[in-house]
């Protein structure tokens, strides 16, 4: 009797699933309630790539009861994100997303709010170059490398993790607010500690985002996240108050000054309020530094393991910059090999294996399939960056793939590594694609270049006892490295 009843229930569920996915892309069969969550394993980004390998560039999965379409093919991505932009521009907002921004920040907002605030931030960041605000990042890179210098030639192994994270956070809060923390200080700046708490909570994922009935079991975790977010909001609100009182329109100090100036010029300045502005600034602090910190950590690891590559970077910097001189952004166009190393690091160990999800605001027809309104849509950044159809030997660290006599690597170009008909700009999207592309991309690239150029011009980085460092990533929301130790030697 129970067997027959179970069979009837199972067949009814199969029929229900077939009906609700009619016309959608293929994918693995989901279980009731949990969907395909049980199949993601310890390395979700790898599991999702295996789904794409099996089912194609458009794959349907269920995260809990949330229907999700995974994109892992560039021509499909281009058609969906670019050609159907108005139908796919909004974010899918989870419970954690609501806690972080309440739909009034840059990462997790929709409609006119997102459009207007992004425009203000984008304009301010463009103007930041006119006022040389990036010089603040340069000074942070100098401070970090001066600190590394205290370890050089001591033969003392160090773990660079905490220092590069402090650099990336310092870069953001100095660039944005004219604030920073000394590298040798044991004191945790309140915003740095709050950001660390947020990252710790978000890094491992939150099951209640897709299984809402679990919320009561995650009350403490959700409250801790809300408290940490609130501390950063308060910090940003205080900074807004101080900056507004001390603003000099002729001599803007940082990004926040420029944002306030943009708001003053706006015909809709009444639309912008301090609480929403503080939430948007929080995005820069928390999300803005993550890519930089993780990429620099991976870059030190790979160049320590590949001494021949590191030597080529050093030789290029000496040739372009000259001994005794300081690398600067003006040198970037002439340091193609260093640029290639940065890009190869971001490809082989992309900090964000999955771009933040979007939601279809209406039915989308693509590739003979339908993505129904309300479906969560994810882009597999890792999947495209490691697909053998587009990259030769994708799991090998090879900066040479980015070099071409006909292309520059300065801004993400290069033509040497992609096979088939896709260009690198289509299969290499560490900062996203389309209007939702990371608004702080330019700042992140500057942070990476300033720090990497100084690190590899001033020091030789080596594994402890010349034993190769483990380059397997830690599977979290971001693709992080396992913490490691290296030995520094000052270049002569």
Curated annotation (Swiss-Prot):
Uppermost EC category: oxidoreductase
Q: Which PANTHER family match?
A: CYTOCHROME P450 307A1-RELATED, HEME-BINDING MONOOXYGENASE FAMILY
Query: What lineage does UniProt assign to this protein's organism?
Result: Eukaryota, Amoebozoa, Evosea, Eumycetozoa, Dictyostelia
**Taking the first listed entry, what is the main subcellular location of this protein, grouped into a coarse class?**
membrane
Task: Give the family this protein belongs to, as stated in its UniProt record.
Answer: Belongs to the cytochrome P450 family.
Q: Where are the transmembrane segments?
A: 1-17
Subcellular compartments? Membrane
Note whether Oxidoreductase occurs among the keywords: yes
One Gene Ontology cellular component term attached to this UniProt record is: membrane
State the name under which the record lists this protein: Probable cytochrome P450 516B1
Q: Give the E.C. number(s).
A: 1.14.-.-
Superkingdom in the source lineage = Eukaryota
The UniProt record lists the keyword Signal: no
**Biological source species:** Dictyostelium discoideum (Social amoeba)
For this protein, the record's SUPFAM superfamilies field holds: Cytochrome P450
Cofactor(s) the record lists:
heme
| InterPro entries reported for this sequence | Cyt_P450, Cyt_P450_CS, Cyt_P450_E_grp-I, Cyt_P450_sf
Entry keywords, A to Z? Heme, Iron, Membrane, Metal-binding, Monooxygenase, Oxidoreductase, Transmembrane, Transmembrane helix
Q: Which GO terms describe its molecular function?
A: heme binding; iron ion binding; oxidoreductase activity, acting on paired donors, with incorporation or reduction of molecular oxygen, reduced flavin or flavoprotein as one donor, and incorporation of one atom of oxygen
Q: Topology versus the membrane, per the UniProt entry?
A: Single-pass membrane protein
Which parts of the sequence bind heme? 438
For biological process, the GO terms are: organic acid metabolic process; xenobiotic metabolic process
């Amino acid at each position: 009797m129970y067997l027959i009843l179970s069979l009837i229930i199972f067949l009814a569920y199969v029929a229900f699933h077939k009906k609700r996915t009619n016309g959608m892309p293929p994918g693995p069969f989901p279980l009731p309630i949990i969907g395909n969550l049980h199949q993601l394993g310890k390395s979700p980004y790898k599991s999702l790539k295996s789904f794409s390998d099996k089912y194609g560039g458009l794959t349907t999965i269920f995260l809990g009861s949330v229907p999700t379409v995974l994109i892992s093919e560039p021509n499909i991505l281009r058609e969906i994100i670019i050609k159907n932009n108005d139908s796919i521009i909004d974010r899918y907002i989870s419970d954690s997303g609501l806690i972080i921004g309440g739909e009034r920040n840059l990462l997790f907002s929709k409609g006119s709010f997102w459009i207007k605030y992004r425009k203000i931030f984008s304009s301010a960041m463009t103007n930041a170059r006119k006022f040389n605000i990036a010089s603040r990042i340069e000074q942070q890179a100098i401070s970090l490398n001066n600190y590394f210098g205290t370890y050089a030639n001591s033969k003392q192994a160090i773990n660079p993790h905490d220092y590069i994270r402090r650099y990336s956070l310092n870069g953001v809060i100095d660039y944005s607010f004219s604030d920073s923390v000394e590298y040798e200080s044991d004191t945790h700046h309140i915003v740095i500690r709050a950001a660390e708490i947020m990252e710790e909570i978000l890094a491992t994922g939150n099951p209640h985002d897709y299984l809402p009935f679990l919320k009561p079991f995650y009350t403490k975790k959700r409250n801790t996240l809300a408290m940490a977010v609130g501390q950063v909001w308060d910090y940003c609100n205080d900074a807004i108050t101080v900056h507004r009182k001390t603003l000099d329109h002729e001599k803007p100090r940082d990004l926040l000054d420029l944002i306030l100036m943009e708001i003053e010029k706006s015909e809709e300045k009444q639309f912008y309020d301090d609480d929403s502005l503080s939430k948007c600034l929080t995005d820069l602090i928390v999300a803005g530094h993550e890519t930089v910190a993780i990429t620099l950590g991976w870059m030190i690891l790979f160049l320590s393991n590949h001494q021949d590559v590191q030597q080529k970077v050093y030789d290029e910097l000496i040739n372009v910059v000259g001994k005794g001189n300081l690398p600067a952004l003006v040198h970037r166009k002439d340091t193609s090999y260093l640029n290639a190393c940065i890009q190869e690091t971001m490809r082989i160990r992309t900090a964000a294996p999955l771009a933040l999800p979007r939601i279809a605001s209406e039915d989308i027809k693509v590739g003979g399939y339908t993505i129904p309104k309300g479906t969560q849509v994810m882009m597999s950044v890792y999947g495209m960056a490691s697909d053998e159809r587009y990259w030769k030997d994708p799991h090998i660290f090879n900066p040479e793939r980015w070099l071409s006599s006909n292309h520059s690597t300065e801004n993400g170009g290069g033509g040497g590594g992609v096979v088939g008909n896709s260009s690198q700009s289509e299969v290499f999207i560490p900062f996203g694609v389309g209007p939702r592309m990371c608004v702080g991309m330019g700042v992140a690239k500057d942070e990476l270049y300033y720090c990497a150029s100084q690190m590899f011009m001033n020091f030789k980085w080596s594994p402890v006892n010349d034993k190769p460092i483990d380059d397997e990533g830690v599977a979290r929301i971001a693709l992080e490295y396992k913490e490691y130790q290296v030995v520094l030697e000052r270049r002569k």
